[in-house]
Amino acid sequence: MEREIAFGLENFNTDINTMKRNVSEVISLLGLNKIRDKQTTEISGGEKQRVAIASVVSMDPQIIAFDEPISQLDPISAEEVLNSIKRLNRDLGKTIILVEQRLDKCFHMADRIIFMENGEIIGQGTPKNIPENIVNKYHLPTITYIFKEAGLQTLPITVKEGRDIIRNNKFQDLKEDDLKFKEVVMEIEKLNFEYERGYKILKDLSFKLHRGEIMTVMGENGAGKSTLFKIIAGMIDKYKGKVLIDNKNIKSLKLKERIKKIGYLSQNPNDYFGRKTVFEEVGYTLKNIGEYKEEKVEQVMKLLNISYLEDKNPRDLSGGEKQRVAIACTIITDPEILILDEPTRGMDAEAKENLGEIIKTLAEVGKSIVVITHDSDFAGDYSHSVMLMFNGEIVAKGCARDILYNSMYYSPQISKIFKNKCNIISSKRAIELLKVI
């Protein structure tokens, strides 16, 4: 890890004494002492981000630009990275430019905010003074938008401010009936997985997924979430236990059957791209299984609002555009089970809302959806059930409202505001409640 931090200094031909001093100081500043002797392959996602930050800071630039540094991180790791960024500004006087979609985490940190659209600056302001043309759902933190939509004059930008606003109000807990799913489409029985060196990644996992269910899977980076669903998607076959799809062992399914049963979106959309245009890319799997129809490709591209990209090279797109193209590649075969690993990464609020509505529509027609995410607000708005993983084990699984509302780290922002007042996890329900105060 130390060598990684020193790499930039080596390229600048920095003398050894200066290099040692800079690396040591940056390691202390960013709290990396515990992992200084580890390989970069052995550390968590949050630690990797902080090492990357340290690599830049060691060269002592005056301006540091961060492009979505917390987009793939769990809540705890995200806070660690943002705290490191704050220290660079506060303690070292660095000028920070932060590009980020997770506004709830960082909006309040800014001295100045620049709003862009279609390559143009459409407004500037501060967290407490936002231009009127910017005050809409897609340019505000979730909690700010919720209070604005409810008609309140005082708009919070942090959980504490939101709690202060409703401090003297009383609410009744929601009494909604939980959906009762009947038909099991996937069952995992005593699944275990370990690397060749004997380190156990997954430990005796068992759970079920039902037809029409939207299940969100959450947990810290390195908890085993992606590994579990790579096994279910058939990408890893050396495991112990059973993966049953419609009561059939997945190992007995032929490739075409598996493609029709399970659609899998990996964390990296670039994994899907090898064709010259987006249109070719989206239709590629259909050609492979002998079911290509041009109108089907057009239909899916329209659904995900990517028709305007059809002639572009998928590798030339923005992060959010790549993500939507990869999702189109995943759902084009109309699979019964859809597994989406970090599907909202790089998406703005509008794209996330559109994706959420697509997921709801698919579930309503009987598709089963698994969403692996760190986005608690997205989970609160669209999940039927939630499964929490820690260190390769399932530590909780159940109704989304029960799991998310009672979680310390994975509850949506709005749940934190209503804590001990109302068991709410959904933005829409929060707006309804706030309209009457």
From Swiss-Prot:
* Domain ABC transporter as annotated: residue spans: 1-143, 179-416
Annotated SMART domains: AAA
GO CC annotations on file: ATP-binding cassette (ABC) transporter complex
Q: How does it sit in the membrane?
A: Peripheral membrane protein
Tell me the residue numbers annotated for binding ATP. 219-226
Q: What is its main location?
A: membrane
Q: What does this protein do?
A: Probably part of an ABC transporter complex. Responsible for energy coupling to the transport system.
Q: Which family does it belong to?
A: Belongs to the ABC transporter superfamily.
Leader peptide range in chain numbering: none
What is the E.C. number? Answer: 7.-.-.-
- Identify this protein by name: Putative ABC transporter ATP-binding protein CTC_00753
> What subcellular locations does the record give?
Cell membrane
Keywords noted in UniProt: ATP-binding, Cell membrane, Membrane, Nucleotide-binding, Repeat, Translocase, Transport
Q: Which species is the source of this protein? A: Clostridium tetani (strain Massachusetts / E88)
**Which leading EC class covers this enzyme?**
translocase
Q: Which GO terms describe its molecular function?
A: ATP binding; ATP hydrolysis activity; ATPase-coupled transmembrane transporter activity
